[in-house]
Amino acid sequence: CIRDSLDGESMPLIHAFMETVESFAQEPSRKHALLDAWVSLKYMVHETQAKGAAAPVHAREYAPVYMDVHTFQSSPAGTALREKWIRGARSFLETQFCEYVEQTIASNPLKAQRGGVPSARATAAAFLRVQLRNAEGAWPPTLSRPLDAATQSPLWALVFHLVRMGHIKDALACVQENEDAIQATDASFLAFFKAWVDDPMRHLPRSMRDHWMGEYVTRFRN
């Protein structure tokens, strides 16, 4: 933010740049890409749109941390700032993807069959119907098993898209409700996934990560 020279209130600077970009008379895709860059920055620094906000982002607020390489890379303040930026960037990508999902469903509502209660799981399943089902209504053979018991959509694709949309609690609930189907091939997946969901920065404990990588090497690379 910057200070308004007329009334001393904080001004959301990134939003001002966004409005400037929107006023450009140029090819839409180029303008959209530039606008996305500013929107992602807004999410990363957590700038609010309201003029005179109670907790604005002040000029050079983060500079003491990121201007010193050692502080940025090695101090708790540097870690906290990087994590804040990561959370903001992830939130932007999740929001952007949710918008794409809604646009896709709206473009083909009959095939989507979302139903009257647009829950996160119903929305993800509707998106998968549009994207993956063929003209006969069949799923691709590689995704036809296992299916989510509630939506009859490919379970692993559903879990992935729930995570991609930022609905990780819904993804965990989906895994828990389909535990029996998962146990047959991935007995430890639920424990690993829950540990990942419960960590604020989406990290696995070192012991779990090492075990997971060992299983990956054994199963997929040998």
Language-model features, listed with the residues they occupy:
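Acidic, serine/proline-rich low-complexity intrinsically disordered regions
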Residues: R3-L162, K169, A173-N222
